[in-house]
Amino acid sequence: MKVSIITSCFNRAATIRDAIESVLAQDYNDIEFIVVDGASTDGSLEIIREYEGRISTIISEPDHGMYEAINKGIRVATGDVIGLLHSDDFFYDNGVISRIVEHMKTTRADFLYGDGLFVNPDNTDKVVRNWIGGDYRLWKVRHGWLPLHPTCYIRREVMMRLGLYNESYKIAADSELLVRYLMTGGLSVTYLKEYVVRMRMGGLSTDSAKRKKMLSLIHI
């Protein structure tokens, strides 16, 4: 099972190396790593290019935001399963992808999610919030629960069939996609009771007030 990991980046020179290194350190061999840079001006692209030959695909061109960049990555991906690692984040350890693949093979799931840690951006050893996904129930989605987006791994054919990220949402396109997939996709969903990712606090995607405002605009 090939896993495509997509990282979008714009002016993240301070953190992009951690993200890249955590992908390259994975002990699973069949990984396609795609980095989509939005024409960064802070040295991010120069850091990314240090890893040419180890990153499967590097795209650098202006875009209209993170979700357009992610969609570009998905369209060129060739993996059986697609996951995201944001440029501020890094994997929990080097066995994450191996455990994801094993669990998806065992359960034959279309969609997997796991647990995550929110960490202090200045001291990533300091955990700010421990996010535990818990067992999947559709009624939980109907009542506003969603899996933690950076822990989600989805079969590529599902994404091609159900559609990619809605680029008109500048903050919560990930939430719109998850609601759409889980509510209308008829998917086999599984929960991996393992930590997948460490997320630095402070980005738009971790601002709960802004996300709640955007979620109120989502219509399925």
Label every PLM stretch briefly.
Residues L215:
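Active-site-adjacent helix/loop segment of glycosyltransferases
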Residues M1-S208:
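Nucleotide-sugar donor-binding/catalytic module of glycosyltransferases
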Residues H219-I220:
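Conserved small/polar residues in nucleotide/adenosyl-binding loops
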